[in-house]
Amino acid sequence: MVVHITTDNDIGVRITLRRMLLLTLVTYIVYIAYNQRDILHINRLAVLALSFVAYLAWESIGIQYSNFTLLNDWFQYTPGNAPIVLLLIILVITLLVYLTTTQRYITPNKWIALLMLVNLIGLILFPMVNDLIPLYVIIELQSYSLYLLTGVYNKSYNATRAAILYFVTGGIASVLILLSSAEVYEATGLTNLSEISTYYSISGINTWTSFDILLIALVFKMGLAPLHAWSISVYSYAPLYITAYISIVAKVSIMSFIYLNIHLFSTQLLILAFYLSVAVAAYTPLYQVNIKSILAYSGILNFGYLLTAVLTNDNAYYIYIIQYSLTHVTIFLCILAITEYTNKPASYWSPIVNVNQLVVPNKALCIALIVCLFSLIGIPPLPGFYGKYYIIVGLMSNGLNLEALTIIVFSVIATYYYAYIIKQLASNLYNNNTNVIATPINSTLGFIISILMVILITFYMYLPTLLDGLTLLHS
């Protein structure tokens, strides 16, 4: 269904956004073909191009339009898409900036930025999908680029192992998506999601089982409980920098699709996934010492919280996913910065594996990481507190008091493994470490971490403006 649009400028900006992203990809491929040695310049080109794409995405956020469809109703752009598109572009830019600096342990690779650009196309298109055919094509676009990205350092045995495991488990989820799509088409003869929703509403036929299969496949893709075991292994085996990327971007894109199309899915399955995710992710890391495993379970826990915001279709979803995504990226950038001080790395691709390796003489960097962990715990006035607060308020206003109490209880339990990491970091503030290399942090990386910390610490100051903007977008 095509709805009227108030201005032609909005359409022009959005079409330009997509053309610019495709032009960036083509330009980047040509540049790589003729310049394969200076990888830092290649990565800087990607950052500059995506910065302009981010500017176009910002300009496309308007409050004076309703939704419209593109490419024969295959994609639907709504006000709810705009913040997610901008967030995904910012996440990719932030992680790409790290590749513009010289690192001690991670070897520069010319294919990483290219795979990220391809993946970004799938990431920003998936929440806009309005048809079963592009749904499968787009999710495979982002999935295959993630498989390749995971195994891009093919000299690492663990990286290759992670890529194969990711490919096999992702293939199982893809089969479930195809099965769901085939059953829906057999029952209705339709592939357009808007038309399918209207058909079910008018006919009164209760055949949502096919979409339940689709939901299970998407939960599988995100690595939420009870289909989470593969994700812990993949994130643990993958190189540290790759883990920082693959553990957040796909989840944001897929969860946003579920949030924007919640009317298609069973709330009972979402509630079940919520309870299992928070229970598993709050309890299991209490016995973990692997820093990537702990952060992987932390991701399951936080996206479990997000499932409740999806259930209530509340604007708290945007507040929580924005603050968690920025906190997640900041934590990994801090850990990557700490690797520059590591004298005895666990491996070349993942210098830091266990919590006791978080030894750093840079007290400012140590404090930044502690602040991020406090935010995950939910200490006010950090953004993690406001994210949980608005989710709990939304649950209670919808009569879901048990779910609100569950979030509070498991947040308290999860505090213990965050405190375990904080204890290790706090010891750096008082002890003189001799098993580290006293080298200054890269100025570019330090600047990015500083900017992110300012955004997180001052989150409460611009939160009212953010809430007003989200309210206007959905009014």
Swiss-Prot record:
What is the protein's major site of localization? mitochondrion
- UniProtKB keywords: Electron transport, Membrane, Mitochondrion, Mitochondrion inner membrane, NAD, Respiratory chain, Translocase, Transmembrane, Transmembrane helix, Transport, Ubiquinone
Name the Pfam families on file: Proton_antipo_M
Which of the seven top EC classes does this enzyme belong to? translocase
GO CC terms of this entry: mitochondrial inner membrane; respiratory chain complex I
Which ranges does the record mark as transmembrane?
Answer: 45-65, 82-102, 112-132, 133-153, 162-182, 198-220, 240-260, 262-282, 291-311, 318-338, 365-385, 402-422, 447-467
| Topology of the protein relative to the lipid bilayer | Multi-pass membrane protein
Localization, per the record, is:
Mitochondrion inner membrane
Annotated Gene Ontology MF terms? NADH dehydrogenase (ubiquinone) activity
**Annotated protein name in UniProt:** NADH-ubiquinone oxidoreductase chain 2
Gene label = NAD2
